[in-house]
Amino acid sequence: MSAESQDSMHLSRREAMFLSATVGMGFAMATRAEAMDSTKTSAHQEPGNCSTPSSAIANTQYGKVRGFVDGGVFTFKGIPYGQDTGGENRWLPAKAPKPWKDPYPALIYGANCLQNLHNFTAIEQSFLQDWDDGYMSEDMLKLNIWTPSLTGSRAVMVYFHGGGYSFGSSYELPSHEGAQMARHHDVVQVSVNHRLNILGFFDASEIGGGGYEESVNVGMTDLVASLKWVQENIGNFGGDPNKVMIYGQSGGGSKVTALLGMPSAKGLIHRASVQSGGGGNIPTGEQSRELASQVMKDLGLPPNDIATLQKMEWSKLVAAGNAAAAKINPPFRGGFMFGPPSGPGSVARVGWTPTLDGHVINMKSFDDAAPEISKDVPVLIGSVSEEGMRYSSNPTEAEWHTQLSGMMGETKATALIAAMKTAHPDKAIRTLSYGVAGLGSRNRVQNMAKLKYELHAAPVYQYFFTWQSPMLDGVAGAWHTAELAFCFDNTKRCEQGTGNTSEAQALAKKMATAWANFARTGNPSQPGLIWTPADPDHGQTMVWDNRCRMENDPESEVRKILLS
């Protein structure tokens, strides 16, 4: 196991999330400090009158839920869509909630899936992102709803959080809050927590026998369960079950592409948006069974001892799982900006991700091909320019050249740096270095859009978010997750990252309108800003910036250097 691989096993959850999209620069570190205390979930409430009237009670098939009204928005947090997944339910498919008699108090966010929390991160990055880790439990199958009214029939926007398949939650970033979309864009906003890491993607099929056939993908079948809950109940919250859009960023985008290829999700999705993610690493069933066997061996357990595993403390489980994966996986030296190998003929790395089991998941969706099963679902897909922003990385040009040369050779590194400097003469070297991952992400967007187009069915729309934040002297650029503040219309809540400037507010209004229009109609255009579907010959792309515009394949000449 390489030193690089060993080091990666000890990364904080925030570093791991960002390294999945970064160049992997190891240059001079910025001052690091303990992350901010995570007991501030309610600190970002939009100003407005808050009340708990009897009118803020809605029906579900399991019983009534009581929410509150904040600034005119009916808000319900932590509604159960499944039972506790701990103990004997660990690695079993989600079970429907048990009915309740009195109104359920849907007043605070539900628990997150158990996960390794961050301990240290760059102070500046903590400031820009403003994370909230909340609290954790295996009783985490909960969803949140924001709606303008409990009557009517509005488009429904269901958001799946990022963090790969191991970290994150429905409320870890202030951008995830849905009141603004309900208040100003007349949609029903939903967000979801589900099982992650070893709790969501461990193959117990040969350990526990019957009933555990879907264990390796329960993190994904949880999401299907949440979408079924939406179909059965969202009408009681003013939503239209026939206009359900799913969307996600980073790992959430990969969840979206996986769902688009899952037979059990057919008919539950009517639009989809994939943001700075999608496709990616999906191991085979054989690989995941090998990993499970190694975990049992390392723990010193008999091969069929599911009972001990279900009683085991989670941190011990995840430590054993990570150690087993490190033993099985070959060292990865490709550079984080390109991610693990993917595409036809590639060999996936094992870990806590969905598995190609031939039942729940039977294809590498948007990797080998776009799924025929969802060909009639319009897709919106895009990325940001500085996907690789990691504030602790501050290279000189010479250091940057050395790093790139080690990954792609000196000739290509020289050509790439020269092309990026020419294309963006006003950007600092530090900001340009963050943009290499953005070019790689653009390549992936282009490929996924091409696969969708080749189905010759529903359209695909591309975007490229390039708005440069003015905060901290502007060096962070348009970082991984930056667009979320805008497509959720949350520049005020995210003012540490956006400055909530007049330019930011204007852009947010346009982007949130586009996302809401897409949810309603499958077309993100709006008056004065027509968004043309993409085709492989032209790569039509909406560029989101202070001057929003359509361009054919932006950054094409620069990004193609990566493919040469």
Feature annotation, model-predicted:
Residues 1-15, 22-23:
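N-terminal secretory signal peptides
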Residues 17, 157, 224-227, 231, ...:
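Non-transmembrane alpha-helical segments in soluble domains
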Residues 28-32:
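C-terminal segment of classical bacterial N-terminal signal peptides
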Residues 36, 40-217, 241, 385-387, ...:
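Non-catalytic accessory segments of hydrolases
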Residues 124-306, 363, 367-392, 457:
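Serine-hydrolase-like catalytic core of hydrolytic proteins
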Residues 280, 316-502, 514:
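Substrate-gating cap/lid region and adjacent catalytic-acid/histidine neighborhood
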Residues 304-306, 457-463, 524-529:
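Acidic/polar loop patches that form or flank catalytic/metal-binding clefts of enzymes
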Residues 532, 537-557:
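C-terminal domain-tail junction helix/linker
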